[in-house]
Amino acid sequence: MTISYSGNFFRLLLRWKGSIWRSVWRELFLFLFLFYFIRFSAPHFFNYTDPTDSKGYRKIFKVMCNEFHEYTKMIPLTFLLGFYVSNVVSRWWRQFETLRWPEDFLSILCLLLPSKESRPARHQIARYLNLTSALAWRDVSTKIRLRFPSLRNIIDAGLLTEKEYEKLQDINEPSPGIRWLTPLHWVQQLIDAEITAGRGSVNYVSVATNELKAYRISFRRLYCHDWVCVPLVYTQVAALATYSYFFFCLFGRQDLNHDDFYSLDAFFPLFTVVQFLFFVGWFKVGQDLMRPFGLDDDDFELSYILDRNIVTSFTIVDSLQDDDPPKFEEDVFWKHHNEQQQMHQSMFLPRVPTSLKWGRIDLSRNAHKHPPKLHTYLEMKNQDPEEYKNRKNNKFIAW
């Protein structure tokens, strides 16, 4: 589910669910295990294989560590991860924008079919809109698939009837990819039947058709995002650059000066761990957001959105449409209408220009009708330079 958070800085750092600690703790534990294994096993290995250091294994190891440290400077990790994660995050937000809300179309539907005789049609159309969401989302979302493993589960949820199930099965056999589109076609047929029967307003047909088209396009875009992922080679480049960088850090960040006990790196690679949290956590952001319809902490809560849409849809077409609006009652603004009108008119009365420290400013509401003059074009009354030198008290220009 999507993690919402609020609070101060320190409380956010201690959050576990959906945090960087939960994303990278396994990789960080493996990195520290290998790092300390190399640190403690290398001296014992050299003492066992070359006690007198006649073969120069220690020198070769130091040279290799220094070379690996230089290799880490040659990998443009910041550039690769920045470009990779920015594309993934923008794609992640575009996928969220494909989630269409039914209340826009249903509000227009209430204007198109406002009578009480059209209530069964409105109710059926609202159910078909949510049926389309359930059919489409179960193809791309793991949570919706677990909620509706088969179409029989959709029947148990009340979004589908037995006759409609049989029709969907008959349509799905010759054309498997059109099943989610079928309820939207039924919506068009219901609207056409109501208009033909004279129970609808023809003025809103075009607007309702455009909204229904936008509703259908949103699901098609969602399928396109699910079919076409970020290129695999791009993900491989980002993963290879990240993990190879810290492979070189296993050797390049070793403390080779064993006599310096005052160095922090002699006990714990602090800055290397900070880099690991930044870069691996950065890469994990791209990995987690690449497919936001799974079971991760920050994936979209489509099950909640579907429940919310069902409740909202039936409330609009049944309760709100059949309930008359409240009768007019005098409120505070209506009682003081005359006072507000007088106050409103007084705001447009001309005002006397006010002289301020920084110059004369016209505070009149009609000042925008007279474009201001630039001070560079103002005529000087007296062009004698000696007089202006003596006027030391006048420090500001009159605009």
Curated annotation (Swiss-Prot):
<keyword id="KW-0869">Chloride channel</keyword>
<dbReference type="Pfam" id="PF01062">
    <property type="entry name" value="Bestrophin"/>
</dbReference>
<keyword id="KW-1133">Transmembrane helix</keyword>
<dbReference type="InterPro" id="IPR021134">
    <property type="entry name" value="Bestrophin-like"/>
</dbReference>
<dbReference type="GO" id="GO:0005254">
    <property type="term" value="F:chloride channel activity"/>
</dbReference>
<feature type="transmembrane region" description="Helical">
    <location>
        <begin position="74"/>
        <end position="93"/>
    </location>
</feature>
<keyword id="KW-0812">Transmembrane</keyword>
<comment type="function">
    <text>Forms chloride channels.</text>
</comment>
<dbReference type="InterPro" id="IPR000615">
    <property type="entry name" value="Bestrophin"/>
</dbReference>
<feature type="transmembrane region" description="Helical">
    <location>
        <begin position="266"/>
        <end position="286"/>
    </location>
</feature>
<keyword id="KW-0407">Ion channel</keyword>
<comment type="subunit">
    <text>Forms oligomers.</text>
</comment>
<keyword id="KW-0868">Chloride</keyword>
<keyword id="KW-1003">Cell membrane</keyword>
<keyword id="KW-0813">Transport</keyword>
<dbReference type="GO" id="GO:0034707">
    <property type="term" value="C:chloride channel complex"/>
</dbReference>
<protein>
    <recommendedName>
        <fullName>Bestrophin homolog 9</fullName>
    </recommendedName>
</protein>
<feature type="transmembrane region" description="Helical">
    <location>
        <begin position="232"/>
        <end position="252"/>
    </location>
</feature>
<keyword id="KW-0472">Membrane</keyword>
<comment type="similarity">
    <text>Belongs to the anion channel-forming bestrophin (TC 1.A.46) family. Calcium-sensitive chloride channel subfamily.</text>
</comment>
<dbReference type="GO" id="GO:0005886">
    <property type="term" value="C:plasma membrane"/>
</dbReference>
<keyword id="KW-0406">Ion transport</keyword>
<feature type="transmembrane region" description="Helical">
    <location>
        <begin position="28"/>
        <end position="48"/>
    </location>
</feature>
